[in-house]
Amino acid sequence: MFIAVVGLSHRTAPVEIRERLSIAEAEVGETIQQLRTHPHIEEAAILSTCNRLEVYIVTSEMESGVRQTMQFLAELKGIPLPQLRPHLFTLLYQDAVTHLMRVAAGLDSLVLGEGQILSQVKKAQQLGQACNGMDRILNRLFKAAITAGKRVRTETEIGTGAMSISSAAVELALQEQGSLSQGKVTVVGAGRMARLLVQHLLAKGAVDITVVNRSLERAEALAKQFEQPIQVLPWESLLNSVAESNLVFTSTGATQPILNYQQLAGVLQPDQPLLLVDISVPRNIDPDVEKLKGVQVFNVDHLSRIVEENRAQRQKLALAAEALVEEEVDQFMEWWRSLETVPTISSLRHKVESIREQEMEKALSRLGKDFAEKHLEVIDALTRGIVNKILHDPMVQLRAKRDIEARRAAMRILQELFNLDPVVFQAQQER
């Protein structure tokens, strides 16, 4: 079996492409099940965030599995593969393993060291498990990646004071406007990103903040988390609130734009200054809004200027994090390499155990019933101990071989010397 990841991220694709390939949380399970109907796709998991869509697969045929995954993504979203392929990346074997662990550790994020990605990796594992998309290998891989992410956050300082998408968005608005204490700010959405937006806005001096959300109850719950007064409005008041604001942030899970040129043209004054910062993928603000005079629109791809300033300061901290990730990669790879040896080791142990039982039965029959009953446990433990000690070193050495060809050569020798057929043995065990 082989591990691969096919995907795109803020490094390979602009937001216009990322939003087209975005997969909503409610659609992940069904999407994985569809992918697993393809030949050669044994396991699958999907990590979908505002800055990346990554499909992790375990495949019996590497080339076919990767090709099928690429074609599946193109057909899923109705994007011709030749148009999509330049934005996709593919990583195989250990490179795929290392990539997921770096992602979970925040080392591949737009904002270096940001913490939200770890919870998103955990969610990807939960969704993959819920639809039976993940089995032994991907479960182990995601568990190892989550461990790597946790270690990086607890054993290094890369997460201390790290920016988030939300804090970078507020910083960008502050640089554009000079001050956040004047005028009204509207935050559209009431999820985690919206909560962080409000938190950072208050920290940067904003005093007149309104939260608008489809669920008024969720918006009220968000507002109650802060001591400062936060106004809450129902969804029907969205356009009025935007028209009264000089700064608007959007952070919702909507799959279509919630603000467009026609809507805003109907409520804004001619040349009314308005700064819109959209941190959602798919985008909440239609690109045609930029045609309005006086209106500035920023999306997640515009945060790079802010992020790079923060990244340069944090690059030294990343070195220690990379070392921890490498340790977790080595541990996973050692386990993964050992999987190939399991059928050979199991068939060898089964054969030797059968011989032990047969020979012990012969010996006990010659020793007589009374002796056998009296000393059965001792003789059984003795022979079992001898067998285990004889097999111990060969098994350890076989599992420990890092070179693939050397390990396979050793397995072939064992199979030939002991007349083993691991494939037949495994089939018998599965009956």
UniProtKB/Swiss-Prot annotation:
Keyword match NADP: yes
Superkingdom of origin: Bacteria
Binding sites annotated in the UniProt record for substrate: T49, C50, N51, R52, S109, E114, G115, Q116, Q120
Pathway: Porphyrin-containing compound metabolism; protoporphyrin-IX biosynthesis; 5-aminolevulinate from L-glutamyl-tRNA(Glu): step 1/2; Porphyrin-containing compound metabolism; chlorophyll biosynthesis
Active site, renumbered: C50 (nucleophile)
InterPro entries in the cross-refs: 4pyrrol_synth_GluRdtase, 4pyrrol_synth_GluRdtase_dimer, 4pyrrol_synth_GluRdtase_N, GluRdtase_CS, GluRdtase_dimer_dom_sf, GluRdtase_N_sf, NAD(P)-bd_dom_sf, Shikm_DH/Glu-tRNA_Rdtase
Pfam families assigned: GlutR_dimer (PF00745), GlutR_N (PF05201), Shikimate_DH (PF01488)
GO molecular function, one term: glutamyl-tRNA reductase activity
Entry binding sites for NADP(+): G189, A190, G191, R192, M193, A194
Site description Important for activity, residues in chain: H99
Biological process, per Gene Ontology: chlorophyll biosynthetic process; protoporphyrinogen IX biosynthetic process
Enzyme nomenclature, EC number: 1.2.1.70
Catalyzed reactions: (S)-4-amino-5-oxopentanoate + tRNA(Glu) + NADP(+) = L-glutamyl-tRNA(Glu) + NADPH + H(+)
Keywords: Chlorophyll biosynthesis, NADP, Oxidoreductase, Porphyrin biosynthesis
Record's signal peptide: none
PANTHER family per record: GLUTAMYL-TRNA REDUCTASE 1, CHLOROPLASTIC (PTHR43120:SF1)
Free-text comment about domains: Possesses an unusual extended V-shaped dimeric structure with each monomer consisting of three distinct domains arranged along a curved 'spinal' alpha-helix. The N-terminal catalytic domain specifically recognizes the glutamate moiety of the substrate. The second domain is the NADPH-binding domain, and the third C-terminal domain is responsible for dimerization.
Subunit structure of this chain's protein: Homodimer.
Similarity comment: Belongs to the glutamyl-tRNA reductase family.
Other known facts: During catalysis, the active site Cys acts as a nucleophile attacking the alpha-carbonyl group of tRNA-bound glutamate with the formation of a thioester intermediate between enzyme and glutamate, and the concomitant release of tRNA(Glu). The thioester intermediate is finally reduced by direct hydride transfer from NADPH, to form the product GSA.
HAMAP family per record: Glu_tRNA_reductase
Stated role: Catalyzes the NADPH-dependent reduction of glutamyl-tRNA(Glu) to glutamate 1-semialdehyde (GSA).
Entry protein name: Glutamyl-tRNA reductase
Gene name as annotated: hemA
